[in-house]
Amino acid sequence: MPYELKKVFASLPQVERGVAKIITGDPKGNNFLYTNGKSVIIRNIENPAIADIYTEHAHPVVVARYAPSGFYIASGDTSGKLRIWDTTQKEHLLKYEYQPFAGKIKDIAWTEDSKRIAVVGEGREKFGSVFLWDTGSSVGEISGNIKVINSVDIKQTRPYRLVTGSDDNCCAFFEGPPFKFKFTMADHSRFVNCVRFSPDGSRLASAGADGQIFLYDGKTGEKVGNLGGSKAHDGGIYAVSWSADSTQLLSASGDKTAKIWDVAANSAVTTFHLGTEVLDQQLGCLWQKDYLLSVSLSGYINYLDKNNPSRPLRVIKGHNKSIQCMTVHNSDGRSTIYTGSHDGHINYWDAETGENDTFTGKGHTNQVSRMDLDSSNQLITCSMDDTVRYTSLTSKDYSSSESVKMDVQPKCVAVGSGGYVVTLCIGQIVLLKDKKKVFAIDSLDYEPEAVAIHKGSGTVAVGGVDGNVHLYSIQGNSLKDEGKSLPVKGAVTDLAYSHDGAFLAVTDANKVVTVFNVADGYSEQNVYYGHHAKAVSVAWSPDNEHFASSGMDMMVYVWTLSDPDARIKIPDAHRLHHVSSLAWLDEHTLATVSHDACVKQWTVTFK
């Protein structure tokens, strides 16, 4: 293969305030699972930089859970589709697909022999279903709750018991198979968010929005007590997870803490304080082997440290909203990837290890649309919050003084030499020098969309929705229209000069990439066809002979300048999501980002 997926830096869990986030583990204890959008993310618990992404659902996925055998994963989405798929092969072949009810699936549980599966959620006619995994035949009826069911679990020892937790403040208890409703437990005064049997089957824990955790006998369903007396947490409890030996319980709460409970002593042995901000609310947790994980409202995954409860061992950061733009900074033989997302976050990633963090301080408050680097190690970004920001790559800290307010919303930014930056706003081209606006062109007869600056001559190429590239030159503190426009096949979506300045590549809405020869008076060098939908991004390789383009067709093409037919096609680079931006780390490594909030690196080999 001329290309190979080298690394995947996965997205964070997609979270919603006041809604529990289910994060599950595998039976062997090596991986953990969560969902974001239409993707199921499988990550190595020891080294989270190792990730695999399953994107076959047509609708956003809510929950995914390994079968106890470890060979299959069941995942459920907002439309009520349940997919059961293979974990042993990279292709993740679909084994079975069911529609237990029409509506959002909120939780899934397997029996310990991996033969029966229970599914609950927001069905229209019913809130749950329990059936054989291979035929779909019913093995009981889930009744007893009169509102949406949030959580389900099945006792992993015989005789089987099944329990559900619902928005009607009740848990329903079932015996089976076939599973029959026995009684409800109406101890909670608010929604029940999570119900879990202990691994040995002796106990059942239920956690609710009333801040209470009730314990029941796993076999009979009789109430045994409630953890911590009257209240276990000061806020709603979204998740609980048992230790492997069934003696302790981990809980996650909206009061921004997680706690470890000694079940026999009925007391909290460790309290993890995870911050004071709203984004520090804890929505999910997982206890797997020696690892204690919790999920914050920010989407961050915290590895909790029993020995130091005030500080997590590590925090996995990243994006959980679509990534809009990226750039790469190479220094001292190391590559750093900078990414900007739909919610205004900017992250920087070590391209080798995947270690990443976010800039500190108060930054953009809305979508980061474009970014570029200047020669003094600053990241220049423009955002829908109507600002252009200059952020030092050494301090990685937002400074309020380094922000330039625009009159209208900026869409694209390009950096030239000598402190010049050109920003395209809606109906406007603005020239900045040394972080100050010095010139603007307001009376445009076209809508500017993309901009690039020739590093040598200072020529500014502006791509318009009118299907032309308009050329300007920077003269002192002004922009002069060169009176020359280069026609392409459709509305310009992106453009880029090669690193040696010899060529200009332009992508357009009509699926075409056009390359112009700069030295030859911007004559058309070649036209490249291949995309099946609008091309959105283009980036040159450091060798100046190859360039990559991406489109709404989820394709990435790597083109050879001298031979338009010698193309490398990377289909489904980010499955079901278009690739929003590209950047080369070196002559053979291409990085891509997408609306799936993931960063991928590809090794490209040329003949």
Swiss-Prot record:
GO molecular function, one term: actin filament binding
Main subcellular location of this protein, as a coarse class: membrane
WD repeat start-end pairs: 4-45, 48-87, 93-135, 138-176, 180-218, 224-263, 270-306, 311-351, 358-408, 432-474, 480-518, 523-561, 566-604
Annotated InterPro entries: G-protein_beta_WD-40_rep (IPR020472), N2O_reductase_N (IPR011045), WD40/YVTN_repeat-like_dom_sf (IPR015943), WD40_repeat_CS (IPR019775), WD40_repeat_dom_sf (IPR036322), WD40_rpt (IPR001680)
Location of the protein in the cell: Cell membrane; Cytoplasm, Cytoskeleton; Nucleus
Gene3D superfamilies cross-referenced by the UniProt entry: YVTN repeat-like/Quinoprotein amine dehydrogenase
Classification via SUPFAM superfamilies: Nitrous oxide reductase, N-terminal domain (SSF50974), WD40 repeat-like (SSF50978)
Pfam family, one: WD40
Family: Belongs to the WD repeat AIP1 family.
Primary role: Induces disassembly of actin filaments in conjunction with ADF/cofilin family proteins. Doesn't sever actin filaments alone, but caps the barbed ends of filaments severed by cofilin, which blocks annealing and depolymerization and allows more extensive severing by cofilin.
Protein name: WD repeat-containing protein 1
Lineage of the organism: Eukaryota, Metazoa, Chordata, Craniata, Vertebrata
